[in-house]
Amino acid sequence: MNMMRIFYIGLSGVGMMFSSMASGNDAGGLQSPACGVVCDPYICVNSDGISPELTRKYLGEKAAENLQSLQGYDPSEFTFANGVFCDVKEKLCRDDRYFGVDGKRSGKINQTTTKMLFMCRE
């Protein structure tokens, strides 16, 4: 009986550890260091799009230099390293960036990232 009790206590501790790792401001490798700011390992964005300033602030000078070396990209549409695509004109993030046969975005709306980026309330 005591061994079973110890087993369940240990199991619940592991469950609590994993649930705390999955909660908070982390969504599939994305971090939200401030309300309305979302970062992956390479870029930081806000509701206006990709931000070199926020990238520098939260990821450092090297990441900002890498971003500024890119030319001809639309900062209002981007795909995070985890594959989540966001469009600031639509104010939506989707699980992927693909289009359906109707020519419209077909990816399922990613509620977590959409809320972190466009619906943050401090």
Swiss-Prot record:
The entry's keywords: Signal
Signal peptide annotation: 1-22
Organism superkingdom: Bacteria
Name of this chain's protein: Uncharacterized protein YcgJ
Lineage: Bacteria, Pseudomonadati, Pseudomonadota, Gammaproteobacteria, Enterobacterales
Gene name as annotated: ycgJ
